[in-house]
């Protein structure tokens, strides 16, 4: 599909998209021509054309953005509290698949995730049950994520809690800031002993790494609410350090 505009593929599954029907059809015919050139055919019974909504690899793709598929939502919503470590891993696998829809997931899921650590005795208590219920609530209330657009103003916001790092990639589209993706990560035992300023700085680094596929080579804004970091990285402060 190299050189064909508006087409995504995963293995032998193809999605062709366009901003309107005319653009969609032009791109679709280009893809069909390419397949014909290399001697490939498609199964008409498995094709869906001119759709405004499509479920693809656990995601519901619409003209307005991306949502978790109803199948993924139901799997989490209907899950029972885990009874052993194997069931914990299975549940967390379901949750992690939809992680980009869930802010501060790592911190929220930490009481459950801790049960998978080596040497930890499995014990499902009140803290794990609260985390389980909050995760169910969070995913079922997930907002629609926007599609990333190269031409739009882009911002990464990062924050740190005592036990985890959280970040969000957003863009200003049509005069409104929309979420592209959330990301989060638990702190290691060593990182938990960092000062808060060090944690906040680490959050910025990890956020840029996590969203590097979007922002590498692009101009973007990096936002933190930690005032000491703003001071440390301000141009005035850096110039003063160089002067000394």
Feature-to-residue mapping (PLM):
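C-terminal accessory regions
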Residues: 221-223
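Short, intrinsically disordered, charge-balanced linker/junction segments flanking boundaries
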Residues: 238-244
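Retroelement reverse transcriptase polymerase core
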Residues: 1-219, 228-238
